[in-house]
Structures are given as C-alpha cells and as structure tokens.
Amino acid sequence: MSRFKVSKFRHMEARPSRREAWISDIRAVTTPTCGNHIKSSCSLIAFNSDRPGVLGVISLEGHEENKRHVTYLGCHSDLVTDLDFSPFDDFLLASGSADRTIKLWRLSGTGEALPSVPGVVLGPEELPVEVLQFHPTVDGVLVSTAGKTVKVWDVAKQQPLTELEAHKDLVQSAVWSRDGAIVGTACKDKQLRIFDPRARTQASQSTQAHENNRDIRLAWTGIQEHLVSTGFNQMREREAKLWDTRLFSSALASVTLDTSPGPLIPLLDPDSGLLVLAGKGENQLYCYEVTPQQPALSPVTQCILENVLRGAALVPRRALAVMSCEVLQVLQLSDTAIIPISHHVPRKAVEFHEDLFPDTAGSVPASDAHMWWAGDNQQVQKVSLNPARRPHPCFTSSLVPTMEPAPDMVQPAEMPRADTDLSEGFSSPSSLMSPSTPSSLGPSLSSTSGIGTSPSQRSLQSLLGPSSKFRHTQGSLLHRDSHITNLKGLNLTTPGESDGFCANRLRVAVPLLSSGGQVAVLELQKPGRLPDTALPTLQNGTAVMDLVWDPFDPHRLAVAGEDARIRLWRVPPGGLENVLTTPETVLTGHTEKIYSLRFHPLAADVLASSSYDLTVRIWDLQTGAERLKLQGHQDQIFSLAWSPDGKQLATVCKDGHVRVYEPRSSPLPLQEGPGPEGGRGARIVWVCDGGCLLVSGFDSRSERQLQLYIADALAQGPSALLGLDVAPSTLLPSYDPDTGLVLLTGKGDTRVFLYEVLPEAPFFLECNSFTSPDPHKGFVLLPKTECDIQDVEFARCLRLRQTSLEPVAFRLPRVRKEFFQDDVFPDTAVTWEPALSAKAWFEGANGQPRLLSLQPPGMTPVSQAPREVPARRAPSSAQYLEEKSDQQKKEELLNAMVAKLGNREDPLPQDSFEGVDEDEWD
C-alpha cells in the first residue's frame, strides 16, 4: 500500500457483542500447550473444557427461541493440546492430545448426539502431539508436530506421507501456506524453517526468528511468500514480525508491544490482510493490517475485553455478516463464556460492498491426497460472499463416514430409559489398543456390560463401536467438611509394593515418618483439623513395609515390618486414644523383609504374605501359625491377589512371569505365563468374576500399560494390551466387581484412569478420568455401602495428600434420579462377613458370599418406572412466519401499526382549535 493511500479499514471498530449473544455457562481451562484452545467452522465451535481430554461443542449460530447448549465430547485420555476443523467439512474435527494420538471426529448438527468413538486414529507418536492443521486445498491431508517431529499425514490411509527433519528442539508451530505447497515451522531452537514436503524432507530455508525461544507462532498471509511470526525478543518484549521467504535473512517489518508474559496468538485473515494479536491471560486485542507491498504492520484498532482471554479463534469468512460490513469476527474463550468480538467497517448504505469482501476460497476441495502428493497444485475455487450470488455447495468428507441412524431411533417410545444420561450429552473416548494387541480382536459388546439394546441402538453401535454406560462418570471431591486436615509427618517412602495407606468403613491407617515404624489411626467419623500435638500411634519398632485392615474385623490391623515379622493390632472401638506398643499377635516365619499382605476374601483369619525370601506364606490367625508356603518365584514378588472365590492366588514377579496357585493343592504354580517386560514394578488383580487377570506394569520403554489375561490360559500370554502413559510410579488398580470398573492411579499422580473391563473384545472401554490439581500420595476404594445410592454414586474413594485426607465420589449423571438405578447397582456381595472359618477353608471347604440389595427403601427401580411420553412441540413463531408469503407479512405489519395508532376515524387534535379571521393575517 502506498503511503499516500489510506486504508479502507481505517475506521474499523471492534466491539464485543452484547451479553445476550455470549455463550455462557461453560467451564474452560488453559493448558500449557501451543494450541489456541478454541476453533470454529461455519457451523460449530469446539473448545477445551476444564475436563482433561474433553472438548465442548456448540453451534456457531444462535437461535432466539432456544438457548444454545454445550455438549461435551470425550476425545482423549489426556489433555487436548490442539484441534482444527476441516476447511471444507464443517462437521469434521481433528484433535491432538498429550496421549500422543490424533483423532478425527464426525460431529453432528445441533441437538444430535456426539460420537463416542473416533472415525480415524493417527499414531501413537513418541511424544505428545503439540500442533495440527488441515491442508487448505486438499481433503484428507494434515500436518502435525510431536516433540521434534513434523509429519504430513494421509488421513485416509492413516499413514504419514513424509516426516520433516532438521528440528533440534520442540516444534511450537507448523502452518500451511495458503496454496498448500509449503509448510512453515517455528522451533524452540529459535529457527523458522520452510519446507516443500513433496520435494524433500530437509528445510529449503531457515533463519533465526526471535531472540527468545518462548512460544513462537506462525501465520501465512494471503501472499504465498509472506508470513507473520509472533514471539519475544531478548528484553522479553512481545513482538510480531513480517517475513518474505525470498529474502529470508531478516524480517521485512516488525512491531513491539509490551513485556506481558502471555504468548501472542496470531489470527490472520488472508483475504483482508487483517492480523489480530490476542495474548493469553490478557484483556486486550490488537488489530494490524499486513501490507507486504510497503512493507509494514499498520495498527488499525484495539479492543478492551471484559474477561481474561484464555484462547481465541477466527470465524470463517463465509460465516460473517457481510451485509452489516462485518469484516472479522474473533471468538474469545474466557473461563466461563465464549464472547464474539465483531470488527465492523461503518458504511452508510446497507448493501454488499465488493471492496470489503473480495471472493474467498469455497468449501469444495481442489483435489485429494493422492493427486496432491503426485504434484497436483490445483487451487480451491473461489466464491462470492454476496448473499445474492453466493453458492451453497454441501461437501461431506469421506474420511469419516456420516452416521445414519436407523428410522426407529427417532421414536422416543422405543428407547429404553435405563441407561439415559443427562440431556446435555457427553461422549467418551474409545480405548486405544497397543500395537501388540492381536489383530483378530474385533469390537463387540460384552454381555456383562449390563446395557439393554434395542435394534436401533445395535445399528448405531455397529457404526460407532461399543461404549461403556459409565463413560459419563463424574469424579469430584466431597465438601471440605468431610476432609481430615493438618496431617503431619507422613511416611511417603513406603515400598512400591504397598498402597501407602489403608482404609475401611470406619478408620484409616497411615504410616508416619518418625522412627519406630509408627502408624497413625484416624477415625473417618471425626473429620476436621487434627491437633498440632502428636497423635497416638501404633509403634511397630521397625520400618513399615505394608499394612492392611481385616475385612471381617474393622478393629484388627495387620502390619508387615522390615524385620520379616507381621504384627496384628487391635484398635479400641472408640478409636486410638493412647500409644500402643504391644501387638495382639506377632507372626514369624519369613527370613527376609515382607512386601505385601492380603486377607482372604471369604474365610476369616486367613492371611497371605509375600517376602523378599521369594515365598508366599499363608497364615492361620486363629492359631498364629504358618499353614502353607508357595514357591517357584525366581525374583522379587511385586504383587499377589486372591481370586474372588478364594480358591486360587495369583502373583506377578520381577522375573517377568505371572503365576496362578491353588494353595491347598500344591506349593508350585498351577499355571505360568509371560508378564510385563519392565522390571520397575507391577500389580495384579482378578477381574470379570474371576475369569480374567489384570496386570498393570511397564513395557521395555518404561511406558505404563495394562495386560489382560484369561485366567485359565496364562501360557498363551495376554489377550489385550493397553498403553497409557510414561510415568515413574506403578499404577495401583482398584477393581469394583459390581460395575466392572477398574480405577488406576499411581503415587504422585494427579489423574485417576477409569476403564470398564470386559472378558471379550474390545476388553477395555474408557470412561471419564478424574484429575486433581495436585498429586496424591495414595488412593484407595471404600466399600460399596459408603456410596450415596440416591445420588447415583457408584464408588467412593479416599485420596491421601501430603497434609490431608479427602473423600472422592464417582457419580453417573442420570435424568430420573428419583428412581433406583438398578442397572448400575446390582446386588452386592457382603464383603464384611466371612463365608467360612479358617479351619474349614484349610480343610478344603469353599463358600459363597451373601448378596445384599442396595435399593433404598421407598425407591422404585428405574427398570419398572413408567416411560415418559415426549411432549409434542408446537412449531415456533419463526417457522410459522416462514410459511407466509411476503404479501401476508406486509398486511400483518400494516394491521399491527394501525392497531397501535387507534381508530382512524377519530378527530385529530388540531380540528378542535379555533381559527383566526382573515384580516388578522395582515
């Protein structure tokens, strides 16, 4: 632009919309990622919610008669780092995550259910995915970054076309040029690089971008050779630079803003050349006009925001209100709302202005991935934004097929009410199988899932695959009044084989760091702040290795010591009031320190212990004698677990084997199979009514993983593998046999994974995880009787922090809570009453636990509840008006105006005035 030529945007105004147009009642969160946290197509908005791995989805266009409601899409098992809509298909969304995968989702229109499984999964990568972007001219191509790696994907084949090399540090930005021929990247090594991915994997050009390596972002202008970068200089000032790839040694122009720490998000509209700079954590937007011809970054306007900005996105140009001269619309993501910010150029005439709205790229791709990779450079056909001439082609990408529900799905009376969730909707991510999972495992629903399906539901499941009815699980901390606070001197260095603390329905036992192996006993019925004085303890005289409560006697605690002894303590019914130094019983027999203790699930006074002497010993607590000794381990025993019927005992060992024993039959293992490869630790638990074994451990790359075994076929190896994440602590599984859910977390973690475990494919159904703001030191599951059944609380846990003990409730959102949810709460086993004595069990007897109904008095099961008849909705006034002709609308408008003016035959006020004589005018 010549310096004597004025800009057509010089009078542009940026105004946040009225509160009525805000999308309120959301909960957003900012994560330390390179993404913008919000994206928009011409139909939908997607944004990061405050739940890890969950995106909020809402319609872009609001309707006056209906308030827009946010639906939630459970995408990943970890934070969503970036997301992008297809430039051609408004309902095709790609999401990248810290779980190292990229997923493509076929979203639906307003009011329709979101998918529960992705249409396409790319990866997993070696590191978390940081950035992704669809190709601007081709359907089925996208670029992504993970660590130092940049890949260009053929989505249809689910394979990378190429991998761009030469990056020496974390890649913070990767963007396509407008014609889709080249890719620009910004790296933490301060370098900007230009790639032609179809020609070579090495960068064709590179230059130093900014002097500081913090959060460098890129955006291409409408001219292929020019791009904009944002970052920080050596003085930690935020700056934006304009680059020409033909003269890449230095920037053409630059502008410096301030020293605010929030990284700048560059939002550039290539058609108008307008650049909006939005700072995370700030309350101001800067708008510049990019003029490469001069060259310059010319300031146009600024906008003060009412709320702090957490993310920002541009609304596509085809969705702007062109008749009101809206040249730009920014969506501001705040903590509790999405706020549209319109940029208008004031004009007198209400008409389409060609100078403000040149033709823009349409919604039909120019080619496909195969043609583009072969060298095709066709460009997307441009379309006019003039409403009178604007075409309305509807392109639907074939990458993810659309879901066409069966006709009977639209009949509400046909749908069962037992598994109905909240109307706002919430979709759960699918479980990702490890690459080593057998390929023959096809998706199918287990009969144990407890979901009654109609033919219409089965036809939908054939498209989406199975999903858990617990996928909408909501975990939350209970009120602070139920917390135990002011904990001091906790022992946080208990062995990895121990849970760190133990709890029953009455009290909690926590090892302390003080000498003498002291254990504090806290009463759950007495929450609040503990006194600053020393607590009464159980003094073991040696370091505590593990501890566990007797399931049939809530006052008896078993403690394993480093001195190879097991001490049994009796806690008074009112709680521990004095220091106890003498245990009720001491069990001796192991020759090395003990690692794990497990009480028998059905027989009273039967205890199993594992030791570093490579044996498992089973004790009769009535006589205080060792009765059985199991052998066959070649290395440290990581974990042991009784089967639900108490007949067998399983172990996982550092020698890389899983073993199953029948203790009363033989001291040697009945079965043996391969276990986790890593030797850092493992846990084992019986699942699926004792038909399967679940082992949590590590692979050879130190990735935490789950292995599911058929209990009768250990030698065949695991039936399924599930890789989770990379972390140092072993995942501690807590299994709920009533729901089939396993809760997994590690010491020092902030997240609790939830999976429904099935004995057949797909074996693992992922549910919403629970995330806490700070790490916990332990996490244990309480008995089912502690749950609030009327609030559909199916699990309650205790979370041990460094200074407090907090209860966590896991609930399932349901619409009709006035009914007993019998599909969620089957009859539960009475685990606090023994089924037989120790003597009977050692003599070969077996027992079964008594079952107890959890149905509260006076509540009707939801399976017997009357079905709701959907109310017929009357057509809205807007629909009624659309059916009228223009002439009818005109007549109604005139009649309404006349009715307001009153009767036209009434005399006018001036008719009653007295006139003047003619001669008075002179």
UniProtKB/Swiss-Prot annotation:
Ranges of the WD repeats in the UniProt entry: 75-115, 124-163, 166-205, 209-253, 539-581, 589-629, 632-671, 725-765
A Pfam cross-reference name: WD40
One GO BP annotation of this record: cell migration
Chain residue numbers at which the record places covalent cross-link Glycyl lysine isopeptide (Lys-Gly) (interchain with G-Cter in ubiquitin): 469
Extent of Low complexity compositional bias: 427-456
Main location: Golgi
Composition bias, Basic and acidic residues: 881-893
Post-translational modification: The membrane-associated form is phosphorylated on tyrosine residues. Ubiquitinated via 'Lys-33'-linked ubiquitin chains by the BCR(KLHL20) E3 ubiquitin ligase complex: 'Lys-33'-linked ubiquitination promotes interaction with EPS15 and facilitates actin polymerization at the trans-Golgi network, thereby facilitating post-Golgi trafficking. Deubiquitinated by ZRANB1/TRABID.
Protein's UniProt keywords contain Cytoplasm: yes
InterPro entries xrefs: Coronin, DUF1899, G-protein_beta_WD-40_rep, Quinoprotein_ADH-like_sf, WD40/YVTN_repeat-like_dom_sf, WD40_repeat_CS, WD40_rpt
Keyword set, alphabetical order: Actin-binding, Cytoplasm, Cytoplasmic vesicle, Golgi apparatus, Isopeptide bond, Membrane, Phosphoprotein, Protein transport, Repeat, Transport, Ubl conjugation, WD repeat
Protein location: Golgi apparatus membrane; Golgi apparatus, trans-Golgi network; Cytoplasmic vesicle; Cytoplasm, Cytosol
Tissue: In the adult, widely expressed with highest levels in brain, thymus and kidney and low levels in skeletal and heart muscle. Not expressed in lung. In the eye, strongly expressed in the outer plexiform layer of the retina. In the intestine, expressed both in terminally differentiated epithelial cells and in crypt epithelium. In the embryo, strongest expression is seen in brain, thymus, intestine, apical epidermal layers of the skin and developing lens fibers of the eye.
Domain of life: Eukaryota
Key word Transcription present: no
Family statement drawn from the similarity comment of this UniProt entry: Belongs to the WD repeat coronin family.
Function: F-actin regulator involved in anterograde Golgi to endosome transport: upon ubiquitination via 'Lys-33'-linked ubiquitin chains by the BCR(KLHL20) E3 ubiquitin ligase complex, interacts with EPS15 and localizes to the trans-Golgi network, where it promotes actin polymerization, thereby facilitating post-Golgi trafficking. May play a role in the maintenance of the Golgi apparatus morphology.
Subunit comment: Interacts with clathrin adapter AP1 complex. This interaction takes place at Golgi membranes and not AP1-positive endosomal membranes. Interacts (when ubiquitinated at Lys-469) with EPS15.
Protein name according to UniProt: Coronin-7
Species, as recorded: Mus musculus
Gene behind the chain: Coro7
